[in-house]
Amino acid sequence: MKKKILIISGGISKERIISLETGKQVAKELKKNNYLVRICEPDKDLLTVIKEFKPNCIFNALHGQFGEDGYIQTILETIGIPYTHSGVISSAKAMDKEISKKIFLKNKILTPKYFIYNFEKTNKELISFVRKKFNFPVVIKPINEGSSVNVYIC
C-alpha cells in the first residue's frame, strides 16, 4: 500500500505564493516516488482533511508565519501526526530574530550588532540613535518574518 503524504501549503503569510509553489513541486516529486499525495491549505477544514485522508506524514510546505514559527507544529504534535520541519520550540526560536540573536551570542557565534526597535522613539530619535551606534548601510528586518519579506537596506 502506498504511503500517504499530506502537503500543507499556502497559508496567510506574506510568503503564501511561494508556499503554494513549494507544495506543488513537493507533490510532483513525491508522486514520482510512488507516494499517494494530497495538498491542502491550513484552514478550517484541515483537521477534517487529516481525519479523512489519514496521512502517514504531513509535509509542511508553509513559509513564514504559522508555518515556520511553531504554530502548525503545535497543532500537528497535539493530534499526533508525524511531520517534516523542526519541532515546536526550535521553530519558534529560529523564527524570532531576537531570541535567535541571544542564542547565537550566548554560544559565542559572531553576529552583526543589532537592536530591537519597539516604536518608543520618534523617527528623529531613531535616526539619531542609529547614526551614533551603527555604520551604514544598516539592515532593517521584522523580528518574525521569513525570507526577505520587508527587509530594507539603508
Protein language model regions, located:
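Residue-level signal for beta-strand positions within conserved beta-sheet cores that form or flank
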Residues: 1, 33, 110, 136, ...
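ATP-binding N-terminal substructure of ATP-dependent carboxylate-amine bond-forming enzymes
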Residues: 1-89, 93-95, 99, 106, ...
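Glycine-rich phosphate-binding loop of ATP-grasp-fold ATP-dependent ligases
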Residues: 19, 112-116, 137-154
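Structured loop/turn residues at beta-strand edges in well-structured enzyme cores
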Residues: 53, 109, 134
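Basic phosphate/pyrophosphate-binding loop/patch that engages nucleotide-derived ligands
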Residues: 103-111
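Acidic/histidine-enriched active-site and ligand-binding environments that engage anionic O-linkages
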Residues: 127-140
